[in-house]
UniProtKB/Swiss-Prot annotation:
Organism of this sequence: Trifolium repens
List of residues binding substrate: 54, 94, 102, 296, 301, 343, 382-383, 421
GO molecular function: beta-amylase activity
Keywords associated with the record: Carbohydrate metabolism, Glycosidase, Hydrolase, Polysaccharide degradation
The protein's Enzyme Commission number: 3.2.1.2
Residues at the active site: 187 (proton donor), 381 (proton acceptor)
Enzyme class (EC, first level): hydrolase
Protein family membership: Belongs to the glycosyl hydrolase 14 family.
Protein name: Beta-amylase
Pfam name, any one: Glyco_hydro_14
Gene3D superfamilies in UniProt: Glycosidases
PANTHER family: BETA-AMYLASE 1, CHLOROPLASTIC (PTHR31352), BETA-AMYLASE 6 (PTHR31352:SF40)
GO biological process: polysaccharide catabolic process
UniProt catalytic activity: Hydrolysis of (1->4)-alpha-D-glucosidic linkages in polysaccharides so as to remove successive maltose units from the non-reducing ends of the chains
Length: 496
């Protein structure tokens, strides 16, 4: 039975639940407040700490530039507050639809898509010229082609408007964190594995830098490095290839040559710079609010065991056995006092088919360790809906990799975990029973705690971002460091 003990509370990991994707529909209507209220009351009774919700750019600013309509979201936030839950708000600058689990379609605003009609290079583009309309290419971050605004200015204005319009919920400390969307699915990555273009697991994916803006950027960078003859890769295969069938990723392939390394560094640095610039804007927008900023990094666990890490490389994570592609991201986030939110916490290597050379457990261990080494908080979520004890136990293990400490804070502890996602299936009786046990175990057998200070999570007013970290300093974090050791299983099993 859950109790309350001061030392054990320091092991408490809060649990949030992701709301359904279409809770506010594409027409900016809060469809079923009564139905949602019933569900939120059940979550609160189960001891859940809060919920996470996508705040869709394509809904809020759909009528025209700077024409924001926050009314439906205000009603939603009001309801969450009445139900006694906290809120994690995602600034969702991507399209909903086309990714794993997308059951509704919410495009980016029509006035932006209209600009894309005459200038399709505003979208990420693969080598064969297919455009991906889920998110604007980083190539237009600083191009004032959106009725005089740059992409970064659009994101910045949106966040400022959110702060102004949601000030009551920021003041009341309902909103505890702002997840800043930085790419497709809200993740800091390229759309390298789009299902709507025919990608299927475990395809290696494709590089997405062939729009004219990124092409020009690459050519300028290559010329500056004294190699004006270098072009973007033309030997990296297509979405559903295996690494060995491509010249780029095969053993001793292009990825290991001077040209290949130059390209991969440029490609991954684009994301670092993109995340850094937008987090800086988010920091300015929410300065002084009692919130944490967070970014999401995708769990690309397939081909992790291959020397080439092909699927990670096409997504923009330049991670090899002798080069850490994640710690530089954590270092960049540290400048903004942010949280790194990672996915696939529920997955075990033994559940994966061997031909995908997949290693989710090692990947989670590497990314979380990298965050902790850079002295930032790390949070996470499951990638796919699961309702079984094995998955819950794996999440609990990752939340406290070295178990609980009965005398104080544990050596390692995640900042929070968000369960994906609220549904009728989750609330089905036997599923919900085990979920309730999961919440209690995440809380280290303690009762639900309303005061985050008791588990060392007091949130001070957001301070200004630290000084800019030069890219060479960020890249020092590519030196591999051994991850922290993980226990083989959790000491707080839901079925133990």
């Amino acid at each position: 039975m859950a109790t309350s003990n001061k030392n054990m509370l320091l092991n408490y990991v809060p649990v949030y639940v992701m709301l359904p994707l279409g809770v506010i529909n594409v027409n900016n209507v809060f469809e079923d407040p009564d139905g949602l209220k019933e569900q939120l009351v059940q979550l609160r009774a189960a001891g859940v700490d809060g919920v996470m919700v996508d705040v869709w750019w394509g809904i809020i600013e759909q009528k025209g530039p700077k024409e924001y309509d926050w009314s439906a979201y205000k009603s939603l936030f009001q309801l969450v507050q009445e139900c006694g839950l906290k809120l994690q708000a995602i600034m969702s600058f991507h399209q909903c639809g086309g990714n794993v689990g997308d059951v509704v379609t919410i495009p980016i605003p029509q006035w932006v898509l209209d600009i894309g009609e005459s200038d399709p290079d505003i979208f990420y583009t693969n080598r064969s010229g297919t455009r991906d309309k889920e998110y604007l290419t980083v190539g237009v971050d600083n191009k004032p082609i959106f009725h005089g605004r740059t992409a970064i200015e659009i994101y910045s204005d949106y966040m400022k408007s959110f702060r102004e319009n949601m000030s009551e919920f920021l003041k009341s400390e309902l909103i505890i964190d702002i997840e800043v969307g930085l790419g497709p699915a809200g993740e800091l990555r390229y759309p390298s594995y789009p299902q709507n273009q025919g990608w299927v697991f475990p395809g290696i994916g494709e590089f997405q830098c062939y729009d004219k803006y990124l092409k020009a950027d690459f050519k300028a960078a290559a010329a500056k490095a004294g190699h004006s003859e270098w072009e973007l890769p033309d030997d990296a295969g297509t979405y559903n290839d295996i690494p060995e069938s491509t010249e780029f990723f095969k053993t001793n392939g292009t990825y290991l040559t001077e040209k290949g390394k130059f390209f991969l560094t440029w490609y991954s640095n684009q994301l670092l710079n993109h995340g850094d610039q937008i987090l800086d804007e988010a920091n300015k927008a929410f300065l002084g609010c009692k919130v944490k900023l967070a970014i999401k990094v995708s769990g690309i666990h397939w081909w992790y065991k291959a020397q080439n890490h092909a699927a990670e490389l096409t997504a923009g994570y330049y991670n090899l056995d002798d080069r850490d592609g994640y710690r530089p991201i954590a270092k960049m986030v540290s400048r903004h006092h942010g949280i790194l939110n990672f996915t696939c916490l529920e997955m075990r290597d033994s559940e994966q088919s061997s031909d995908a050379q997949s290693a989710p457990q090692e990947l989670v261990q590497q990314v979380l360790s990298g965050g902790w080494r850079e002295n930032i908080e790390v949070a996470g979520e499951n990638a796919l809906s699961r309702y079984d004890a094995t998955a819950y136990n794996q999440i609990i293990l990752n939340a406290r990799p070295q178990g609980v400490n009965k005398d104080g804070p544990p050596k390692l502890r995640m900042y929070g975990v968000t369960y994906l996602r609220l549904s009728d299936d989750l609330l089905q009786e036997s599923n919900f029973e085990i979920f309730k046990k999961f919440v209690v175990k995440m809380h280290a057998d303690q009762s639900h705690c309303d005061d985050p200070q008791e588990y060392n999570h007091a949130i001070p007013p957001l301070k200004r971002s630290g000084p800019n970290i030069p890219v060479d300093d960020l890249l020092e974090a590519t030196k591999p460091i051994l991850p922290f050791p993980w226990d083989s299983e959790t000491d707080m099993k839901v079925d133990g």
